């Protein structure tokens, strides 16, 4: 069974046992969180229903570096910045 869950205004299509990266959550590593499911899809009877999903916070990490490069032509102005977004890895325990 798959479910469409919403975490921090983003939607993810997951099933039990999946590990996904989501925007940083305030929960500590090892905590269990309940999130709402927008829709559960069961291939056997094609039933659509809402409910809750249980996820476990595995760790807090930082995403890959995104390079931001700005340049003004003919003025010898160049600026290069890097940005790393904070992410949380979670595991879906049950739907």
From Swiss-Prot:
The name this protein goes by in its record: Large ribosomal subunit protein bL21
Domain of life from the UniProt record: Bacteria
InterPro entries: bL21-like (IPR028909), bL21-like_sf (IPR036164), Ribosomal_bL21 (IPR001787), Ribosomal_bL21_CS (IPR018258)
Keyword set includes rRNA-binding: yes
Record bears the keyword rRNA-binding: yes
Quaternary state and interactors: Part of the 50S ribosomal subunit. Contacts protein L20.
A GO term, aspect molecular function: rRNA binding
Role according to the record: This protein binds to 23S rRNA in the presence of protein L20.
Keywords: Ribonucleoprotein, Ribosomal protein, RNA-binding, rRNA-binding
GO biological process: translation
One cellular component term from this protein's GO annotations in UniProt: ribosome
Family of the protein in this entry: Belongs to the bacterial ribosomal protein bL21 family.
